[in-house]
Structures are given as structure tokens and as C-alpha cells.
């Protein structure tokens, strides 16, 4: 079946394309006539939230995006950060939420494929991937099916392509029942003098189509990704793309070989809105027009219309502006790799986007108004209502050991081994830390000592309670996780997942979170260099928890001094760095409240950014000195869970006497921010320890020696000792049991 270009443009058709009446009027004013059906599709694709960021652009501009290490900030396919010696790291995080809910395997797989293309389009070879996944309640009938499909899709694509998955997150909450989140991160290495951008340059130059053939899969995908879901969700299945990781691997090698030949002027991957978005972005960025001849586009289905070809989101495709004298060489490279190579258009000097098909001009539009001059909204927003503070004596009690075992064996804090064992975490041979620690770490190929650390973080329940503090905390925890390996945090990418921005309370969540992210990034010297916004994550009016995911990258100068989470030896001192005098105080929004007592009240823990920076810099200096043998940031579940994780990672127990005369619940389960647990290899009664104590006093950092490693059990204060084997059994049991339940 093919779709005519002369379909009548009705109000119903306009609405079906996600365009509001005032937006359609703007189209009429710009074009001076009724648009063709293909033109309507082009406007719909370019003006939706997924491509235009029309609801969030105003606030994204407030984020810090520069720094001495930043080579390329937002606006390109990925961010680029200098790591010295002529090398740079290229990275980005992007959502594939809506497709993954409709068709979990292909949705997740093509999410991985898309983010890998964003990285190698810039000239970088991918070296690491992460995935931040949010699913509905474990007892929801769809959850297990979605988990199985998404994890299989992530592993199927990443493993076949050949990139290690080094970290990520998996969480469950009923607010994701109708909208799961699949946020995919990728990073690659490139040379600082060989970064490739998407800005077209030069008039009359060939525009070249590269990669796989075009089919009807994914038609309307970008528009679907900008809409709320309803009960007819399964009808959207045809708009999910289908990925082929082996073709993508060939595309990677062909692109890098072509880039090395000097043939590439500009290059853009075909992601959301396919040929439309890639062509418009290349032309608009370069202040050039683009003319495309769709009769030249390689297709794998018969009788495809111009509309379908322009909006197809078939995977593993690129668009490039080529040096004309290199055409034969470029074509030979792509044919060698078994890929299509076709000159499908040219650059022009008239700022028009023209599309030809079967002898007709099916689109003739102003390219800048499609691209960087798309509509932008200053949507009304209201400050979200914040929860009341908890009364000082509002500390519900529980047996400390029993509560710890229940937390470790629950849906949110249990081991994710079932997930990451389906991913190839060691391919390429450079992975230095397996998933399950604070951050993934990968050696920098060709350098004797350098490594890169990667972490992905956000605590949605904090963001729901207070978006500003939640935004700050997402950045701070990411920065802290990188620091806990010994890495210097360099820069971050954000993936902002929210509900319907046309509701002022939801827009208020977005505004608050972005303000918090911006303040934290400025205070920590941790700029945002790339990112993605995913809105309308709602089903039948029920929105997700606000989830501004932060993916961070850090540099380890000497990976021989890198530290891991697990205790390294018996009889080593345990240090709690950055804590208040009572070690822990804050129970509002804690997992202890939620999972032990069924409470979701109270404010989230505040983040003191000056304290965060001071403590993190101190921890990093201790690690660099070589005396730290293990490190772990304290987050969900407080000190108790952090100590248990360190014990389980090593099989070594610990004894931590606790505080006399202090309620043990906030001590062990409080989620105060800015804290680390370290083990040291030095004599706690020697001069070296005295010098460290003196330095901490001068910095105003409270860092008590709270206990020692040793034995095969974890003993917290007066609570009964828990054998490390029992901790592991609780921790490792939940996920396999959940996934093995009979359907």
C-alpha cells in the first residue's frame, strides 16, 4: 500500500499528527498555502517534542554546558570532552521509552543502536554502554514480560555489536505501570583532531545516504514518542523500529574508515524522524538548503510513498555531505562492508528543503523554520507542593538486622545480577569493574594508566517530593559514584523523563529539576554536554515519577589506584567520611520508610553542594595517595545497606559498634547525602592517620573511624550479627524468583 501526497488536510488529520490548531496556522503562515500530505508529516516530525524540545528548550538553556575540558556541548549528536594526550570521550544518553513499552525487545534494542550511532557519527569508537531502566510494580501483569523483553533487547543488540555494558539502573514503581523508561547511554573514544559534526558546508555538494535500506518500520515513531498513551497502545506496534546489530557493526567500521579517508564534510545519523530530521538538521545548522530525490533512496519495500520514506525510522542509516572528489573511494568502502551508498541529493544556497519523488516536488519548505526556528513554548508552571517536615520524634522502629535483610531482598535494592549477566560486560577486554559497584570502569586503549568511569543516577521518589532537591541529588550521586572509584568527574549527560508538560504541575517538576541539576553541575564543575528530553510519559492521565536521569563520565589518571566497593582485607579500619555527628539523620523519602513501614512522606534529604564538593575532593585525594582499599557512596538504605554491599562484594564481614545513646534507625538507615564509606590500609594508631585527621579538621569534614573489617558476618551496633552468606542469599534471591514465576 502507498499513501498519496494529495490526501485532504482535515482537522482530524492535523490532530492525528500531534499538531495543535495554532501550530497548523503557523504552518499556513510560513508556507503561504495548504501543505501537502508529505509536508504535514515533515512539520509534524520536526515540531514534536522529541525533535524540537519546544517545551523544554527555554529551561535547557539555563544549564551549564562549558568548561575547560569541554570540546563540544549540546547541539550535536553527542558531547565531547578532552581527556588529554590528544584523546577525547564522546558520550550521550537518550530515551527509547515509548517504543520499549509497545514492543520491549525491539524498542530496547533499537534504543541501544541509536545511541551507539550518535557516538560513532562523531568519529568515536564505542567503548562502553549503560542502561537506566524503570518498570512498573512487580505484581503488575505486564512487568515481568517487559523486563524480560527489554533486558533481552539491550543484551541482544549490545552483545552482538560488541560493546561492553558496564553499568546502569533497574527500578520498579507502580507509577511506571503504563510507561516504562529505557534510557540508553553510550561512550566512545576519538582523537581531538578528528571529531565529525553534522553542520553542512558548501553549496552544490552531494548528500549521500549510507547504511541499510529504508522500509516502513518506525513511520511516525518520533510523533508517537511525543504523545500520551491510552488503551489503544497495541495499535502503535507498527511504529516501532527493527534493529540489526550486525549491520550496525559494519556501519561503524565503514564510517570510521570513510572518516579516516578525509571524505566527510558533515555526517548525521538517521534517528528520530529519519531522513527528514537528519537532512533538516544538517542544512539548518549550516545555513544551507537541502534538495532530496527520493527516487534515489535505497528501499526494501515496494511502492513506498514520499511520506513513508521521509518519516521511516528504519535503523542503521546515516546521511552525509561528501567531498565530490572522494565519491568513488567512499562508495567502494561502503560496498566492501555490504552497505548501501547512494547520492540522494545536494546542498543548496536558498535555505529551502525540497523533496522530489517520481517527477513531482512533494515538499518545498523553509528549512530554518523546520529546524532551529521551530516553535518554542514558555509553558505555565506551578511550584510543586512540598511534603511537610517530619516530627523529630517520628522514627518508626524495627529490628535493625531484620529490616536490613528485608531491604536487601526487596525489588529495589536486590542484586541486579540476573540483568547484567545477560550483558557482555567484558568484550573489548578493557573493563576493569563489573556492574554492581558504584561505577563501571574501562581502560583507555593505547594508554598505560588511564581509565574512564561511568555512572547513571537518579532517585525518582526524591524528585517527586521535591524536584529541585531531587535534581541536585541526581547530579551529586552520579558525581559521588565516579569519585568513589577514584575518578575525577568530567562532565554529564541528562535524560529528562517527565509526564505531560501542558499540565502546570508537571511542567513545574521539569523546571524544578532542571534548576536543581543546573545548580549542582555549576557547584561541582560537572557540565552537561549532551542529553535528551522525553515528555508525555503518561497513560490515561497517570504520569510517571519525574525521572531526570544523569549519566556521568570521570577520568582515572592511574587505574592501578582505582578502588572497588568490596572490602579488600580483614582487619582494616572503616571510615565514614562526610557524615553529620550522629552519622545519619534523614528518614524522609527513605527506602526504610517505604519498604519497612509503607510510608512515602517527608521531604527528601537536602544536598549541601559545598559540602559535597569538599568531601568528594578529599575522598579523591585519599584514593590517589594509595591508602584507600575500598570505597562506596552511601545512598539508598543508608549506612547499613552500604556496609552490607561492601561485605557481600568481598565475602568479608565487619563490626561497626554504632553510637551509644542514639536511636539506631536513622544512624543505620538515614539517607543523608554527601557520605562515603572507605577502608584504609594504614595503622589507625600511627602518624599517617593523625595527619589525615588533622587535614579533615582543617577542611571541616567529619570522618569518624566507625569500625573494622573482619570475620564472616556483619555486626551493626546491638543488632544481631548477620552472616555474609545470609546477606548474599537475601540479596541474590529476589530477581531470579521474580523472573522465574509461572506466567
From Swiss-Prot:
Pathway: Purine metabolism; IMP biosynthesis via de novo pathway; 5-amino-1-(5-phospho-D-ribosyl)imidazole from N(2)-formyl-N(1)-(5-phospho-D-ribosyl)glycinamide: step 1/2. ATP binds at residues 53, 92, 494, 531. It is found in: Cytoplasm. Substrate binds at residues 95-98, 117, 241, 313-315, 534. One of its GO terms (cellular component) is cytoplasm. It catalyses: N(2)-formyl-N(1)-(5-phospho-beta-D-ribosyl)glycinamide + L-glutamine + ATP + H2O = 2-formamido-N(1)-(5-O-phospho-beta-D-ribosyl)acetamidine + L-glutamate + ADP + phosphate + H(+). It is an enzyme of class 6 (ligase). Keywords: ATP-binding, Cytoplasm, Ligase, Magnesium, Metal-binding, Nucleotide-binding, Purine biosynthesis. GO terms for biological process: 'de novo' IMP biosynthetic process. It holds the Pfam family AIRS_C. Its EC number is 6.3.5.3. InterPro entries: PRibForGlyAmidine_synth_PurL, PurL_linker, PurM-like_C_dom, PurM-like_C_sf, PurM-like_N, PurM-like_N_sf. Belongs to the FGAMS family. Part of the phosphoribosylformylglycinamidine synthase complex involved in the purines biosynthetic pathway. Catalyzes the ATP-dependent conversion of formylglycinamide ribonucleotide (FGAR) and glutamine to yield formylglycinamidine ribonucleotide (FGAM) and glutamate. The FGAM synthase complex is composed of three subunits. PurQ produces an ammonia molecule by converting glutamine to glutamate. PurL transfers the ammonia molecule to FGAR to form FGAM in an ATP-dependent manner. This is Phosphoribosylformylglycinamidine synthase subunit PurL. The lineage of its organism: Bacteria, Pseudomonadati, Pseudomonadota, Alphaproteobacteria, Hyphomicrobiales.
